[in-house]
Amino acid sequence: MYDYIIVGAGSAGCVLANRLSADPSKRVCLLEAGPRDTNPLIHMPLGIALLSNSKKLNWAFQTAPQQNLNGRSLFWPRGKTLGGSSSINAMVYIRGHEDDYHAWEQAAGRYWGWYRALELFKRLECNQRFDKSEHHGVDGELAVSDLKYINPLSKAFVQAGMEANINFNGDFNGEYQDGVGFYQVTQKNGQRWSSARAFLHGVLSRPNLDIITDAHASKILFEDRKAVGVSYIKKNMHHQVKTTSGGEVLLSLGAVGTPHLLMLSGVGAAAELKEHGVSLVHDLPEVGKNLQDHLDITLMCAANSREPIGVALSFIPRGVSGLFSYVFKREGFLTSNVAESGGFVKSSPDRDRPNLQFHFLPTYLKDHGRKIAGGYGYTLHICDLLPKSRGRIGLKSANPLQPPLIDPNYLSDHEDIKTMIAGIKIGRAILQAPSMAKHFKHEVVPGQAVKTDDEIIEDIRRRAETIYHPVGTCRMGKDPASVVDPCLKIRGLANIRVVDASIMPHLVAGNTNAPTIMIAENAAEIIMRNLDVEALEASAEFAREGAELELAMIAVCM
């Protein structure tokens, strides 16, 4: 029996396993549906290009047909191994915008506000470039570094952005977010530094930590409304793990998996559960609702040189050389995360913060890397950072081995369409600026024939895809309709919490891995200190005063 059963060894679950098992008196069980993270493609950064097709390491979900995207069902990759999506993502380290956390504070209290979040980000971070400062930490387990390799086209993109009157930003996690620049990544010595690598690998030998992989969670076990364990399927056999008296079940399966498991276990909207023959444990209608994601559209151009990372016979000598550089020195283009540069911009000058994000790739990327695009080219990803559209996760079946219903409801709010049109226009302006124009051969997609707003809208409906940031399906809040309270306890149930991206009340303006890790760090402290909501607010006030004092001291010393 265990004091804590953590379901899901992703970005959040690995942090929880580390922190909670640090107390040798507590027994911790970590369940993961996928295998151990031993595949070398996980740890070689450019291996990301081959991971989308791996059904072993990737849930490879499909959405429901999207009404506003010409009825298309979209591919939704999610990590299925130790480290979760942090083991298959592009490693971009972005915290989001300060205003995101002010909104969280409005929803869930000061312990989830900006001052507390910044404190945690700094505690977790081991930045390889920046010294310990107002914005960065150097003593944490999460390695954050500059890329060891940057393609000349990625540098040209940043220069072109400045030529298009966008400022250069040397630190997207610093004083301000706006601008173009190079992404810092979760890498160390040219290798991926996933949540598993950062928080789990170093504690595998702890005698009080049991890790069970290839264990597909099928049901949360309740006695009345108290969680007492978890059922899982491993090698077609059903197993159970139970908690001690007073022990807790911690759900960290992500914005898709957590609401799905709750509904399979009888927690959700009563009518939907009844429809699928699931016995009701607790009627909690908001489970699975409030789904938010970053919708993305690309500009793909052919290059007039062989500077990009290409798929061609002429690239073979460079590929062989790059392999040797990586194997023996951990250097070269195989250390690239592909999304080397990018930026944050406003769709219109009157906005008070960026609502568009760019990821520039010095290569062709077609269908999430699942289809090979031959030749030499480059791709600009453009995503709507602050979408207004909301979707849901639901049940398709009561069978735990069947995937859930995923309906992001993309572009259901017309403001999102307007934002993406603006993004295409700004993106084209950057790619037509002198530093990029000299590499330009022709626009492959959408093609130069697509010019008017109506033509751009139709292209968005035909081609837009996820950029992999689903959140919000077990919304945190102070209001009684929220799924979890500010201590992340599920309302109306006992001994069970949610700790992952599903608790975000609002999607952050940026990549979601770092914020999810921060959520887990905050949750671990709440759990270990046994804080209630009232104590949380008191602790947050103390943290705010301490943060303000620290910032004042830094300002004096600078």
Curated annotation (Swiss-Prot):
Necessary cofactors: FAD
Positions bound to FAD: 3-32
Record EC number: 1.1.99.-
Molecular function as annotated in GO: alkan-1-ol dehydrogenase (acceptor) activity; flavin adenine dinucleotide binding
Key word Transcription present: no
Keywords: Cell inner membrane, Cell membrane, FAD, Flavoprotein, Membrane, Oxidoreductase, Plasmid
Active site: 469
Free-text function comment from the UniProt entry: Converts aliphatic medium-chain-length alcohols into aldehydes. May be linked to the electron transfer chain.
Assigned GO CC terms: plasma membrane
Subcellular location, record wording: Cell inner membrane
Organism of this sequence: Ectopseudomonas oleovorans
InterPro entries: FAD/NAD-bd_sf, GMC_OxRdtase, GMC_OxRdtase_N, GMC_OxRtase_C
Top-level taxon in the UniProt lineage: Bacteria
Reaction catalysis annotation: a primary alcohol + A = an aldehyde + AH2
This protein's name: Alcohol dehydrogenase [acceptor]
Record family assignment: Belongs to the GMC oxidoreductase family.
Database matches in Pfam families: GMC_oxred_C, GMC_oxred_N
Gene, per the UniProt record: alkJ
